[in-house]
Amino acid sequence: MSHNSFGHLFRVTTWGESHGPALGCVVDGCPPGIRFTLAEIQAWLDKRKPGQSRFVTQRREDDLVKVLSGVMLDDDGETMISTGTPISMMIENTDQRSKDYSEIAKRYRPGHADYTYDVKYGIRDYRGGGRSSARETAARVAAGGIARKVVPGLVVRAALVQIGKHRINRANWDWSEVNNNPFFAPDPAIVPVWEEYLDGIRKAGSSIGAVVEVIAEGVPAGIGAPIYGKLDQDIASNLMSINAVKGVEIGDGFATAELSGEENADEMRIGSDGKPVFLANHAGGILGGIATGQPVVARFAIKPTSSILTERRSIDSDGNEVDVRTKGRHDPCVGIRAVPIGEAMLACTIADHYLRDRGQTGRLK
């Protein structure tokens, strides 16, 4: 199985399966001299880890990360300094229940990658989905913690903006609320609505989809490239690689189909500091594949978790028609824990383009 890496100069390779002994990543291309602590990386993993509320999977994993290579310790004994060699990180799996999946060893779960993995490779790891499990994304979050340190002044934040048909009120958007509720919601008024709604979904053994919005501030103007190296092209590709993601939009995205040219234009003026300013950001901070210096804005849609208790029609690997009810511990809304994953993927993409621009033009330090 190939295609386990993404990025060009800031290149991330992930490894490991849902029910294996461990998983992790190798970050290749991190510049020397990047300073970070284990606690800083762990904080992002803690945001993603399972079992933190009744609205996510009850699998209990501490997701404690170990840095195995590519760094030296500073004199304070805590700060790690990248050496420029590959940074390898590992996270042990400690709460696997492979027996929960014995009944689907030959049965294909509708909506999962069971059938497609089997038809391509002739073998699949049915224990929690193996490599196709969202468990793999813990490694991406660890890599994202490094990426945030590569670009000076970069701030990447994300929030859940929709569950099912229930959307936030954007007039209530408050970043300080995101970490005060189990949904990473920026609108405190939507929290009780989502709680009641998801409780019903969860008790019925069903699942529901969601939309995550991720925003990067401090993105240097000029990074990216035209045609086949566009910044938004890579953002879309990398966000689409997240498990269960079925759609990505940049800026106003599909809503631009309803706008006139006058409405959609991001007009410009000269600011009081003599630098260009934009009067709007319909483009989501990217024009012609190149960053404008405005916030980079993306959203991605996540399908309902395919593992549900409702019996569904399917087939098995012997060609028999069967009914499948999925056991195990699963997220009723996988979009909740996708928030820090989206942050990590955007951070890695921007770090990669930052280094590519620095290598090509030499204008960024």
UniProtKB/Swiss-Prot annotation:
Pfam families tied to this protein: Chorismate_synt
Pathway where it operates: Metabolic intermediate biosynthesis; chorismate biosynthesis; chorismate from D-erythrose 4-phosphate and phosphoenolpyruvate: step 7/7
Gene3D superfamilies in the cross-refs: Chorismate synthase AroC (3.60.150.10)
Q: Which cofactor does it need?
A: FMNH2
Task: Provide the residue positions that the database annotates as binding FMN.
Answer: R131, S132, S133, N243, A244, G288, K303, P304, T305, S306, S307, R329
Q: Per UniProt, which keywords does this protein have?
A: Amino-acid biosynthesis, Aromatic amino acid biosynthesis, FAD, Flavoprotein, FMN, Lyase, NADP
Q: Which SUPFAM superfamilies match?
A: Chorismate synthase, AroC
Whether Lyase counts among this entry's keywords is yes
UniProt entry tagged with the keyword Lyase: yes
Identify its protein family.
Answer: Belongs to the chorismate synthase family.
Protein name in UniProt: Chorismate synthase
Organism, as annotated: Sinorhizobium fredii (strain NBRC 101917 / NGR234)
Q: Which gene encodes it?
A: aroC
